[in-house]
């Protein structure tokens, strides 16, 4: 038997307490259908937001990559100013020759001289260079969109490579060249770029398409620009070599 409530000053008996509580609980709880509707709405919103968040992340990574390349460009021009117009060398890509270069702080390769200009730790001091489990962190060496890591027995990881043809040879050489001696406008001469391999130098076939099916390039004048894959890649080992806005080999 349920107790009934009578409102003070009222002539009528109120609803029974048991009936009132039962009615309250029935109205306050979600039905299965209502719960499924809520879940469906959340799923739809998540599906709408994920692409937006993904694009925002990609844009942030691209921005950081561009900033890295601009810093390398700035370091290059400071180096040129301090070294009688001479550019740093492209160096050597892998193995024992690279290691011998890294052990020589006076060697003129870009990966030795430019960090010094920027007052950054030397490349040989980077823990991720030999340890694929090391935290990459935020570094001018690292493009946040590049997932490449060290794979044993490799001892190097370059997310950015220097164009092997800027001196006109198309191969790594060990004689420095002056910026003013390059017969092509510095605004179109490729300097550093997003590296799809791991050596410190490369050509059009080394570029990686990690920024919305494109890549970032720095040029000898210091500016940085993103190009679509179709502008530098044609499926060959060296990529497109006749794009006037991306000059790889500076001497005819």
For the regions a language model picked out, list residue spans one by one.
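Short, well-structured segments within or immediately adjacent to enzyme catalytic domains
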Residues: 65-252
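Phosphate/pyrophosphate-recognition segments in soluble nucleotide-handling domains
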Residues: 15, 22, 38, 106-112
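Amphipathic alpha-helical segments typified by the pilin-like N-terminal helix
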Residues: 26-67
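Intrinsically disordered, low-complexity regions enriched for glutamine and histidine
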Residues: 9, 21-25, 47, 157, ...
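N-terminal leader/signal peptides at the extreme start of proteins
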Residues: 1-32
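N-terminal non-cleavable signal-anchor helices
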Residues: 7, 38-39, 248
């Amino acid at each position: 038997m349920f107790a009934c409530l009578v409102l003070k000053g009222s002539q009528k008996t109120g609803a029974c307490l048991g009936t009132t509580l039962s009615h309250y609980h029935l109205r306050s709880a979600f039905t299965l259908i209502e719960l499924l509707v809520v879940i469906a709405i959340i799923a739809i919103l998540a599906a709408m937001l994920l692409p937006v968040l993904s694009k925002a992340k990609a844009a942030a990574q691209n921005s950081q990559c561009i900033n890295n390349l601009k810093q390398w460009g700035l370091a290059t021009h400071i180096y040129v100013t301090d070294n009688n117009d001479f550019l740093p060398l492209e160096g050597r890509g892998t193995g024992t020759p690279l290691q011998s270069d890294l052990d020589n702080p006076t060697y003129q390769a870009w990966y030795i001289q430019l960090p010094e200009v920027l007052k950054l730790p030397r490349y040989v001091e980077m823990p991720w260079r030999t340890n694929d489990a090391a935290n990459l962190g935020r570094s001018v060496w690292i493009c946040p969109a590049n997932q490449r890591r060290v794979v044993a027995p490799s001892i190097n990881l370059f997310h950015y490579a220097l164009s092997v043809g800027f001196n006109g040879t198309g191969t790594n050489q060990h004689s420095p060249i002056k910026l003013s001696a390059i017969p092509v406008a510095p605004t179109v001469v490729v300097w550093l770029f997003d590296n799809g391999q791991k050596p410190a130098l490369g050509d059009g076939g080394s570029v990686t398409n990690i920024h919305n099916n494109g890549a970032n390039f720095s040029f000898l004048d210091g500016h940085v620009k993103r190009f679509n894959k179709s502008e530098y890649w044609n499926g060959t080992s060296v990529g497109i070599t006749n794009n006037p806005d991306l000059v790889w080999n500076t001497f005819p």
